[in-house]
Amino acid sequence: GLRGMAVDHTLILVNGKRRHRSSVILWSAGGISDGAQGPDTAVIPGLALKNIEVLRDGAASQYGSDALAGVINFNLKDASEGGSIEVRTGEYSEGDGSMTYVSGNFGMPLGSNGFVNTTFEVGSSDETDRSVQRTDAATLIADGYEGVPQPAMKWGRPNVDDDMKLFINFGADLGNNTEVYGYANTTTRDI
């Protein structure tokens, strides 16, 4: 989170509207974010973003208590024509964590005064492992205790297969100071 506060103390907006919280509750062994439940911004493909606005000051008086640390607004692309394709691949210097992702974004007109902008991303990444055995766990193992995992604490990134994201942003001017707009997304990944 911003300003050293828990992740659910930063308000996340998409196109100026509140983003719902994730179903994941964070736990990091006594960290500042224990019990926090913030939005999952990893479901937004980077290619879908027009820009990101960050308000680093507390904004609780304007937005409520979930903006104590600040506000981050993800603005989605709203082009009604054109597009792009992006391919990313790489790995860590340790020889693990290889990843490959393909993203695409394209805009289409919606009537004479509107747009539909669609972004997809598919890919996968292999796990990374930077674990070392904790000394207290190593002592327990040396003393004959069974059931102590090796390593006791894993550090790294899990294997991610079939990581698929789809974001659709749309809007249209209906005249007479009336506008219809919205966005929809779906995502799935096997971890």
Regions found by a protein language model. Name each.
Residues 33-36, 54-55, 86-89, 146-154:
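Extracytoplasmic loops and strand-loop junctions of Gram-negative outer membrane beta-barrel proteins
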Residues 7, 46-49, 77, 111-113, ...:
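Outer-membrane beta-barrel channels and translocator barrels
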Residues 81-84, 94-191:
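Transmembrane beta-barrel wall of Gram-negative outer-membrane proteins
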Residues 5-6, 26, 63-68, 98, ...:
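Short, glycine-/polar-rich solvent-exposed loops and beta-turns at beta-strand/coil boundaries
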Residues 1, 13, 39-42, 66-87, ...:
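N-terminal periplasmic accessory domains that precede
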Residues 1-24:
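Extracytoplasmic beta-strand/coil segments of soluble accessory domains associated
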Residues 8-9, 19-21, 58-62, 92-94, ...:
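Short beta-strands and strand-coil junctions in structured, solvent-facing domains, enriched
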Residues 17-56:
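Short acidic/polar hinge/loop motifs at secondary-structure boundaries
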